[in-house]
């Protein structure tokens, strides 16, 4: 059995390098999170970004490797 380490964080828009944005749509974030291997996603309203639990690290936005250029 091989385990894959999962994490929690904001979903990464791989095209822009930014967080995947949202307004109040938990369904959209939850669906996107699950498509990326997570188990639950929601729109974190204060950051206007999709937060995902249980996704692979490569699917998540990280401050240290931020390539968004201040857009979000």
Curated annotation (Swiss-Prot):
Keywords noted in UniProt: Antibiotic, Antimicrobial, Disulfide bond, Secreted, Signal
Tissues in which the UniProt entry reports expression: Expressed by the venom gland.
Residues of the LCN-type CS-alpha/beta domain: 7-69
GO CC aspect terms: extracellular region
Chief place where the protein resides: secreted
Protein localization: Secreted
Gene3D superfamilies named among the record's database cross-references: Knottin, scorpion toxin-like (3.30.30.10)
Biological processes, Gene Ontology terms: defense response to bacterium
SMART domains: Knot1
Extent of the signal sequence: 1-5
Molecular-function annotations in GO: sodium channel inhibitor activity; toxin activity
Disulphide connectivity of cysteines: 18-68, 22-43, 29-50, 33-52
Presence of the UniProt keyword Secreted in the record: yes
Role this protein plays: Antimicrobial peptide with weak activity against both Gram-positive and -negative bacteria. Its antibiotic activity is potentiated by other antibacterial peptides such as Meucin-49.
Family: Belongs to the long (4 C-C) scorpion toxin superfamily. Sodium channel inhibitor family.
Protein name: Antimicrobial peptide MeuNaTxbeta-4
Lineage: Eukaryota, Metazoa, Ecdysozoa, Arthropoda, Chelicerata
């Amino acid at each position: 059995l091989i385990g894959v380490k999962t994490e929690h964080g904001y979903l990464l828009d791989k095209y822009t390098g930014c967080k995947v944005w949202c307004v109040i749509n938990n369904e959209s974030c939850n669906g996107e999170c699950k498509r990326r291997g997570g188990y639950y996603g929601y729109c974190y309203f204060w950051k206007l970004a999709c937060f995902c639990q249980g996704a692979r690290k490569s699917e998540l936005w990280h401050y240290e490797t931020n390539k968004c250029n201040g857009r979000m």
